[in-house]
């Protein structure tokens, strides 16, 4: 996987609370077993009408956000069923980071396992991001994973975030769980050589 050290991107603002996994990826699209293609149906029922026409008022249909790698959402994102497909859809669409003031635990773990960084911020900082993007849709955020800081480049406001040390190392090195173990192989072998049974 690609290493994640820093990211600067415009953001997609979705100031809706309690977005559940069925809204992220409706159940009728869960039949596929490959992770690819799920991005096409991310927020499907909000993006398209019953005739499959794009709903112009929905934020993902605004061309100004086509290159955005950061999704900013309301509180309690990813609640509902534990479907990993929700994380697949977000990753396949191209998002690298999701920011909220609270995530459902299972979604948060699924996101990290699919190399999407879920970052928890204060309600105050979240509101400031939405306000900045409302004033200027080209507002960018910089995610500094090494120092665990989010920088709102429009206002220069900073917010520290917390991340599990193991997951942080995986993101910084582009490792999944297997890659992490393989990287430690020499230490494991050294331990086995020196271990007295």
Curated annotation (Swiss-Prot):
Catalytic activity entry: (2R,3S)-3-isopropylmalate = (2S)-2-isopropylmalate
Associated pathway: Amino-acid biosynthesis; L-leucine biosynthesis; L-leucine from 3-methyl-2-oxobutanoate: step 2/4
One Gene Ontology cellular component annotation held by this UniProt entry: 3-isopropylmalate dehydratase complex
Superkingdom field: Bacteria
Organism placement in taxonomy: Bacteria, Pseudomonadati, Bacteroidota, Bacteroidia, Bacteroidales
Protein's job: Catalyzes the isomerization between 2-isopropylmalate and 3-isopropylmalate, via the formation of 2-isopropylmaleate.
Organism: Azobacteroides pseudotrichonymphae genomovar. CFP2
GO BP, sorted A to Z: L-leucine biosynthetic process
Pfam family, one: Aconitase_C
Family per similarity comment: Belongs to the LeuD family. LeuD type 1 subfamily.
Keywords associated with the record: Amino-acid biosynthesis, Branched-chain amino acid biosynthesis, Leucine biosynthesis, Lyase
GO MF annotations in UniProt: 3-isopropylmalate dehydratase activity
InterPro entries listed in its UniProt record: 3-IsopropMal_deHydase_ssu (IPR004431), Aconitase/3IPM_dehydase_swvl (IPR015928), AconitaseA/IPMdHydase_ssu_swvl (IPR000573), IPMI_Swivel (IPR033940), LeuD (IPR050075)
EC identifiers of the protein: 4.2.1.33
Protein name per its UniProtKB record: 3-isopropylmalate dehydratase small subunit
Complex and partners: Heterodimer of LeuC and LeuD.
Alphabetical list of HAMAP family matching this protein: LeuD_type1 (MF_01031)
Membrane-spanning ranges: none
């Amino acid at each position: 996987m690609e290493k994640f050290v820093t990211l600067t991107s415009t953001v997609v603002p979705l100031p809706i609370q309690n977005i559940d996994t069925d809204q992220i990826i409706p159940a009728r699209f869960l039949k596929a077993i490959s992770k690819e293609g799920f991005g096409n149906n991310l927020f499907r029922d909000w993006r398209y009408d019953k005739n499959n026409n794009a709903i112009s008022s929905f934020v993902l249909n605004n061309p100004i956000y086509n290159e955005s790698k950061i999704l900013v959402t309301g509180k309690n994102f990813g609640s509902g069923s534990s479907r990993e497909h929700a994380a697949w859809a977000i990753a396949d669409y191209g998002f690298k980071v999701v920011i909220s003031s609270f995530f459902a635990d299972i979604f948060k773990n699924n996101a990290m396992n699919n190399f999407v960084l879920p970052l928890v911020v204060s309600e105050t900082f979240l509101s400031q991001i939405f306000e900045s993007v409302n004033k200027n849709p080209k507002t960018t955020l910089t995610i500094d994973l090494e120092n665990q800081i989010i920088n709102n480049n429009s206002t220069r406001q900073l917010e520290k975030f917390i991340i599990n040390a193991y997951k942080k190392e995986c993101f910084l090195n582009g490792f999944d769980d297997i890659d992490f173990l393989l990287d430690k192989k020499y230490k494991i072998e050294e331990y086995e050589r020196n271990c007295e049974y």
